[in-house]
Amino acid sequence: MSEEIDLSQSFKAYDVRGIVGQSLNAEAVEAIGAAFVDILGLTGDTVLVGGDMRPSSAEFSEAFARGATYRGANVVMLGQISTDELYFASGQLDAAGVVFTASHNPAQYNGIKMSKAGALPISSATGLYDIRDLAQQYLDEGLPVSSDAPQGSTTRRDVLADYSGYLRSLVDLSAIRPLKIVVDAGNGMGGLTTPAVLGDAVLPGLPLQIVPLYFELDGTFPNHPANPLEPENLKDLQAAVLKHGADLGLAFDGDADRCFVIDERGLPLSPSAITALVAVREIARVQAAGEASPVVIHNLITSKAVPEFVTRAGGTPVMTRVGHSFIKAEMAEQGAVFGGEHSAHYYFRDFYNADTGMLAAMHVLAALGGQDLPLSQLGAEYEPYVATGEINSEVEDKAGATARVVAHFEGQPVEIFTMDGTTIAAADGSWWINLRPSNTEPYLRFNGEGATAEIIEPIRDAVLAIVRQEQPTD
């Protein structure tokens, strides 16, 4: 029995994440495996278990399997997988599952992303904290002495070929013009999935010449952190795109569920532009099959170009709060064909409403390879506005800072709404800003967008000065 691990430190709102040996160890993971089965009622059912390339993922996978089989589940070990491979397997096999990963966090971290059968997300609102509480009890008091059901079995299965074939069935790249692409896997799971899906590792080759960067699976991340959201981590990819004269670059995060795109000039294409591009393609595809006004989900931080493109294409845009669980819930409720976030998470109805960066990347490749323009010109069409990006301010009184900003715009021709934080938008549509408090850190997050840089930049500077209680410099 252990009293050293406090699971409240590692169980977050949407997943589990902590430092190995401090807030997660094999004993704790075994207890989590047992609690996962008990809380979700999975005795006698199949549970899928996989992990990324982190040093502790294999050990944790085995520990989770011990706990799950002890409580009567039949475990299928998937080995090393990306997060979207788990979602695929959970949807395809209609089985609950987990993947051990800490995504883009540093090497000393690991964590767990969990799904119910059908790739349905598990969050604090749908059982994650119940699993935590029972696992803590098992950790403190020991697992029940005698299981009330026969122990389950353990088998092994590789889903990489099935996953690759399924993605290729959704986007046909066989007839595109030849493209040279640089892919930075960041020593993460993209080093396994890219050769399988886009290369010829398990299926016939495509008209793609792949220049690999950091495909070796290494959970110590020897080259750079596997977090493409940070511009510093894109520098090697940008340099390689220019060096090799590539048509585009792709950067995956550690568990390969997010993908960032670089054009032939070495410049990033925003996730909002990707969302708009993919949305237009998905709307056209399902309209051709007879679906009227297909729904596309986007969070309120994506560019206002997204709902404009969706509407123009004959779709119905639906805005939601920021966050994995909100998008997935809205995808299911609305029967949406596609959803996108500013953080480069892309959700597809045909992928069990789950997110997959690889499928989004395939849409970009299909769009680029289906015409002759370079990506910079193709992408510019979907990026008509100027965005500030997300800017964090460390503020103790987040509500007070927000109130000061609202007061600043009082009497001006603006609209204010409070779906997720506070959004202030010009009545003439020329700019908008959003202030959103972090739930876990003392940060107030600022996002903004304008018709031009000349419009949005002074507003950005004034708002940040008010938030930080400074005076803007002339």
Q: Which ranges hold each PLM region?
A:
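Gly/Ser/Thr-rich active-site loops/lids in small-molecule metabolic enzymes
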Residues: 202-207, 212-214, 267-286, 357-366
